[in-house]
Structures are given as structure tokens and as C-alpha cells.
Amino acid sequence: MNKIHINKNQFSDLINLLNNVFYPLKNFVSKNEFIKIINDKEYKNQFFPLPITFGITKEIYSKIKDRKSFDLYYRKKYLMNIYNVSFYSLDKKKISRKIYGINYLKHPYYKRFIKENFKFMHFDYQSEKKKNLQHKYFVAPSIFKKRLKIKKISTLSSFHTRNVPHKAHQWIHSFLFKKF
């Protein structure tokens, strides 16, 4: 198996990493970086509250554990080549308690975190296919800032929610993107 087909969450994290949304992070974290972020909420001497990981299931790990290079695909489209792949494990219950709090067992993402993250991967990447590393609802921060400058907008308000955007949110975003 020289291919890894990634899921929607991994694709989203990958796009965000490549577009500096998680700045100063440029890659999925290594084990040492993960522990530093969880314990100190810090990465490269800057506040960083949650590690951005690339987890794989037990099934995928059993197929790829001896390889060091792969091609990443999302929805059958080539994204990039990854190499210098290293795998690591963590005490997921201990980590979950730090991430989700003392009632971590009741947290909606706890079971998903355990199920989807048998092992974690850290790697370098090359040969990105930029065209396939885009999403119609994503605008890179750098492009968004340029649009603001062009329109001479000096004030901006925003909001954030943990909830998944529904159709009304998508319509609002689409409407606002067309305005810019």
C-alpha cells in the first residue's frame, strides 16, 4: 500500500496547515511537540492550546507500518507525497483528560479520538498538487487579508462556534465571499 486515503477532518487540517491557519505550526506535530503543547500550551515559545495531529486507525497502521513514504489522496485525488514517516503512540486516556477535562468519557469527541487514532504519524511532505488542496468553502487568511485591504475595510467582527455550520451558515459565508 503506497497510498493513504485521508478523511475529511485530515483534509481540513492539511489545508489549514498549508495555509498558515495554525501558525506557527507548519506540519502535523511529533510526539515531543504534542506533549509540549498539551502540558505547556506552547509551541515555539508561542501560545498554542491544542496539538494538530495526523492519526490513523489500527487497520491502516497494520497495512503501512513498515513503509516510510506514501502518497496522500482525498476523494481519489492525489494531494502530495509524504516521506520520513514516523509513528508514535500516546496514552490516549491521559491525553483525553487533559484535552476534554475530567468528564472526558462523556465528551462527544472522546470515542472518536480513541477510534480514529490508534497511532499518530509525523512526516515531511513534497510534490503538493495545489489544485487538489483547495476547498470551495475555504479562503486562505492571506487572501482574505488582501481582499480586506483592497476594499479598504478597517474594522471586522467575527464569531466562532464549535457547532458544524448548517445550510444557513453556508449561505451566509457564500454571500459574504461573493461580496469580497
Language model features: what each stretch is:
Residues 1-170, 174-180:
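Non-catalytic terminal extensions that flank enzyme cores
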